[in-house]
Amino acid sequence: MRNLRNLSDSDRDFHPYGWRIGSLALSLACVIAFIGSSGCSVRQYALHKLGDALAQSGTTFASDDDPDLVKDAVPFSLKLIESLLAETPRHTGLLLAASSGFAQYAYGFVQEEADEMEQRDLAVANALRSRAKRLYLRSKSYGLQALELKHRGFEKALRENPKTALRTANASDVPLLYWTAAAWVSTIRLSKDNPELIADLPMVEAMIDRAFELNPDFGESALHTFLIAYEAARQGAKGDPEARSRKHFEEAMALSKGFQAAPLVSLAETISVKNQNVVEFKSLLNRALAVDVNAKPAWRLENLIMQRRARWLLSRVEELFLVPDETTTNTK
């Protein structure tokens, strides 16, 4: 794993994909009042069906072109999911929706704001990071609950021998493995002074490795983009870390056909910064800014969020590089 200084600063270990919450939130909320007056068996059946609908809902948020609007709307959807989980705690689809939803919200709207606030108000930035950590922990908890339901004794076995425990995981578990590991590693990045959490890294690595083994193309480059940053500092792995990161970058770009900004941003803020290659850094981020957010509506929100990060990173060239080049930074 990379050193703790790098873990806590500019690089990111995963990117959001899907934003699969919210499309049914309002209509489901209206139905809940009716369910409350129904008989027990009817009520449980209806709640389970509502859970199915919410867990399988489409990508309304994903295609939105207004990140600030989504930022305000997502908490309502997340609390609705939690309300349904209180009634149907064994609904693995809802647990996955909660795990992915809280991780995405923490990443795209809380931790991102913390990074941007750090130079202006450190106290506010630290408060935001503390909040992001709590949200990531909630995401991780929901993911582990779902995996426990699918594989009895999973968490205990994971802590005893991660690789052995994960042999029981199958392709249907990949989304849970991804989101649980993503939230977990993000918690660790925000807890560099907590040795107990840092000691969890072997479990995170085992989960990501198993997910990659089962479905390397999951999320249309989600795992590859995660591994761009992660491989750069993985401890004990064979081969050149940079070569591994660049291989995942190429795979992510191929799978997304160049329509995702996240791989470009990830390589720039990990490998380019590490190598102090400001020319490559600017080139990658300007390519990220050039991604047409309307070409793939399902990735519109994610691309807008990553393009905002690209602009912020370009504004920090003088902080990130000892000898920046003389070209003009593109912050359009």
Which residues does each PLM region occupy?
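Short, positively charged
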Residues: 313
